[in-house]
Each structure stands twice: as C-alpha cells, then as structure tokens.
Curated annotation (Swiss-Prot):
The keyword Transmembrane helix does not apply. Residues 1-25 form the signal peptide. This is Maltoporin. GO terms for molecular function: maltodextrin transmembrane transporter activity; maltose transporting porin activity. The keyword Protease does not apply. The gene is lamB. Induction: By maltose.
Amino acid sequence: MKMKAKWLPIAAGVTAALASQAAFAVDFHGYFRSGVGVSTDGSMQTGLSDNAKQKVGRLGNEADTYGEIQLGSEVFNKDGKTFYVDSMVAMTSNGSNDWESTESKFQCTSANGTALDGCENKEDATFALRQFNVQAKGLLGFAPEATLWAGKRYYQRHDVHISDFYYWNISGRGAGIEGIQAGPGKVSFAWVRNDRSGTNVDGTYNDEMNVNTLDLRYAGIPLWQDGSLEVGVDYAIANPSDAQKDSANAQYKNAKDGVMLTAELTQGILGGFNKTVLQYGTEGYSKTFAFWGDRSWYGAEAKDGADGFRIINHGVIPMGNSWEMGHQLVYGVGNDMWDTNDKWETMSVVARPMYKWDDFNKTIFEGGYFKDKNKSTNGTSEEDAGYKLTLAQAWSAGSSFWARPEIRVFASYLAQDKKEMKGNAFNNGTADDTWNFGVQAEAWW
C-alpha cells in the first residue's frame, strides 16, 4: 500500500498533464537538414560564390545542420472569435562536433587566451527566435474572415525550393491585417521592421539603421484556368537617428526611402506549377536584386538614384509517370549602387530532374550555372562565373518531388569559369574546382 501511495501524486500529475494537453492541443511543426560530407581538400566546400546555393542549387551543396521547431496553439475560441499563439526556435551549425553550443571559440589565441589579429570567433552553433506572434480572427466587423496579427513571424514568404532562394520575404517583427476578401482576391497589409546593419562600400561596419517596411498585397486574382496573379508593393522607410544624421558617415545622411513592385503569375501545369515573377525597385532595393536579397534587408547605403529589377521563372512540373523536373531561371540587375558602380548583373540557371524507381526510391540530378558581372563607371568590367553538377540517390516517404523525410547519398562537382572578382574559391584559395561527397537527410512536418 505504501508503494501505491507513493506513486499516486505522480499518476495524478501525469493524468492532469494529459487532460490539459487534450483541452489545449499544441500544433507541432518543424524542418531540418543535416548530414555528413567531405571534399577533395578536407570538409565539404560550398563557397563557389556568395549566395552559392541560391545560384547553382542546393542539392549536394549544403554543409550545415539547420533545424526549426514550431509550436502553436489556439488559446481562445468563442462566438466566432479565435486567438492563436505561434512560436518557432531555429538552430544552425556546421555539424562538425557532437556537442555544439553557443560557447565562443576563437580559431587562434595568444598565450593569455585573447584573440589574435585575423582570427575568427568560431561558435559551434547559433540559436535564434524566429517567430513569436498572436494571430486573431473574427475581430474585424468589416472583414471577419481576416487575420489580425502582431509579433515576430514568417510573413507570406515566396521562395524557390531547389535553391533555397527567398525572393519576396519581409519576415520579422511587425503587425498587420491578412486576408481581407476584396472582389476575387484577398488584400493583406503589414508593417515590419527590417533594420540595416550599416555596411559601407569599403566594407566597414557601423551601427544599425532603423528601417521600417510597409507591405501591401493583393493575392489570388483569377486569370484563366489554373492561372492566378499576385501583386504587391513594398515601401522601405529609412529612419536614421539624429546622431546618425549628424555623423560624418554619408550612408546615414544620404539614406533614401525605396519602393519595390512585385507581380507573380502562377500557372498550374499537369499537377505541377510554374511561376513567373517580375520585380522593380528603387534606391536600396537595387542591392536586393543584385545580391540575391529576399527583402528581409534593405540596402539603405545605396547611392541616391540607384534602381534595379529582377525576373524569375521557377516551378516543378511532372513529365510522365516516372519523371519530375524542378527549375529556376533568374536575372537581376542593380544600377548606380555606389560611386564607381554603373551596372551589376547576375544570372542563374538551375535544373533538377528526378526519376522515380518506385514509391520510395529515386535518382536525382541537379545542374546549375551562374554569372555575375560588375561594370564600373570607367567602362571596365569584372566577371565571376561557375557551375555545379550533382548526382544523388534518395530514399523518401513517397514518390513525390516533395515527399519527405528523405535521405540522399550524393556526389557534386563545383567549378569556376571566371574568377576576376572572387579569385580561387576552393582549397584555401589554391584551386578553382572541387568534389563533394556526402549523405544528407531533410524533413518537414
């Protein structure tokens, strides 16, 4: 009897917890990728270019461990009014050790333990709070279907999966009204803070400058069978402090507001989709298009009068019963972004065909090519270019292109065609090509 009495409080606690769980259900979502790999010179090398995987594809070109854990719950539901609390924590690391923490580790130190010049602070892992927000429905009499939200959140992100390229993404801390029915489509409005860490053209760093973005979108406009349109405008407000305005730093004194226009046409094809995106921007948005920005940052330091545009085509299309193809085409331009810059062009082509052997076994190919060109005001030009070829064998929970979890064994070859700006990209600056071999798992739920 004593043993039974001893366990009664524990049993009661477990019962209460289970009852609470049933009454207060928690939605559990997440994403992760991780694995192991080597190159012909040590660990995997993915530095073909800045934003390399966005330019030549991510398959066999990711050396990190990255994960997101999302927990959310509807905490109130009465008379057609609901409140939902959402949260997400993310972690990233290079995956080099078993125990990975945020402890600071300098790559090289002096005898007394201080960092020497030229040494980097190497943290094993970085953790971040990505989302924490409240979303409420049924509160607005003029639009009961709309969502009123505030906090930190992923906000209507548009991306190309095969390259992990986000081209329309103002995620951050903010507030807004989402999904107001207006004619055939829905209107959303948001105010989000996207501060700019001050980066001069010469590479020095300064205090962050406050930047606020106003985002207006009209989505779900039907055009024809399986065709729809989304349009939007983003207005970035550069908001330097009085001290920054009075400083000698020209990037703060001359920072200008910018406007970005986006139109995205979506067409359903054979059970897949194709998207064509047109974007135009002024001032700091010129850097967004030249340097593969997603709009979560605004290049406030750009020279007065800068502008740019970007054209994107991407999608995933079935080709018969056994093949599916993912693709990306990107062309971006930034004009007059700093005193010596006339025009910066970037282009990318990525294709990922996949053959399904059965419901769980597939072979994947991925090829990507990019070219960057910087034309100066004196008429001279510099170019970087390169490519990646990947072959992978994969096992996944289903035959679809999107089936996950998935485990892949891969081999990738990366090489530079031109290296006038970057120089040799591999083997500590001594080689212009490399091989990567590895195994990676990816999952979302």
